[in-house]
Amino acid sequence: MEGVELKEEWQDEDFPIPLPEDDSIEADTLDGTDPDRQPGSLEVNGNKVRKKLMAPDISLTLDPGEDSLWSDDLDEAGEVDLEGLDTPSENSDEFEWEDDLPKPKTTEVIRKGSITEYTATEEKGDGRRWRMFRIGEQDHRVDMKAIEPYKKVISHGGYYGDGLNAIVVFAVCFMPESGQPNYRYLMDNLFKYVIGTLELLVAENYMIIYLNGATTRRKMPSLGWLRRCYQQIDRRLRKNLKSLIIVHPSWFIRTLLAVTRPFISSKFSQKIRYVFNLAELAELVPMEYVGIPECIKQYEEEKFKKRQKRVDQELNGKQEPPKSEQ
């Protein structure tokens, strides 16, 4: 093969063995005296030819040029002692590379399909994030971290009467605002949390105190969400619901219930009762363990001041003496 001019057209039959992928190919010369080196394309017939190879002008080539996929930089990076590198926990969540490649974070190094090793703290924290609730015959996972600011929406208010007749308090002022980007995700997890908690709290008959005061329209749950809650409640819980007391009902709530009354069963409609202040509520249920949010108390105080001011103005207007005619 001496004197034969090499062209850029390479044939597969000229390579009886696979080209080396892990070892570097010398760019300047092919040294045939190295016993550890794989035979190249010019040593097929046993002839040792020392000829300089020119890298083809293409982006993906097997020659070790500057634009080659198998460059010296990558070969040197592949020979790094992995055991000598610092682990992410020892190196502030970053790997140190010896070349000019960007330094990825640990989340970028972990690829799909790899197994993430948790520390004891992370494992404990992840266990707290998710909680299983049994609704009907199925188990549902709830993202407890996502709904953490809204868990006060439902609480246990003690018992009433004889036996384990539970008082369940539902405070709408703790609902998320509808303008949040993850609103649907929050409401879905909050729905499971409310239904699952309700089944845990209720043993026999129960009542729901619906605190509607101090709630903006953006925090009001939709009618579909409330209807879904009622439909997902177990039949036993729907039957054992003895009363739904709506405290500080707004005009919107009363109008909504009036419009939907034809579509609600008469038995459920008879369970609804409006209460306009906390004093009236205290006459119906024991308030010892009923947690009233501070915003509800402030809301009632402001309403009382406005009402008192209006009454005073009316009384002062009646007490003014009539003007004498001139």
Curated annotation (Swiss-Prot):
GO terms for cellular component: centriole; cytoplasm; cytosol; intracellular membrane-bounded organelle; nuclear envelope; nucleolus; perinuclear region of cytoplasm; spindle pole centrosome. The keyword Disulfide bond does not apply. GO terms for biological process: apoptotic process; blastocyst development; centrosome cycle; positive regulation of MAPK cascade; positive regulation of neuron differentiation; positive regulation of small GTPase mediated signal transduction; response to oxygen-glucose deprivation; striated muscle cell differentiation. Its main location: cytoplasm. Keywords: Apoptosis, Cytoplasm, Phosphoprotein. SMART domains: SEC14 (SM00516). Residues 147-304 form the CRAL-TRIO domain. Residues 1-47 are annotated as: Disordered. Residues 10-33 have a biased composition (Acidic residues). It is found in: Cytoplasm; Cytoplasm, Perinuclear region. The keyword Cytoplasm applies. The modification Phosphoserine is found at S41, S89, S92, S114. The modification Phosphothreonine is found at T87. InterPro entries: Bcl2-/adenovirus-E1B (IPR022181), CRAL-TRIO_dom (IPR001251), CRAL-TRIO_dom_sf (IPR036865). Pfam families: BNIP2, CRAL_TRIO_2. Implicated in the suppression of cell death. Interacts with the BCL-2 and adenovirus E1B 19 kDa proteins. PANTHER family: BCL2_ADENOVIRUS E1B 19 KDA PROTEIN-INTERACTING PROTEIN 2, BNIP - RELATED. This is BCL2/adenovirus E1B 19 kDa protein-interacting protein 2.
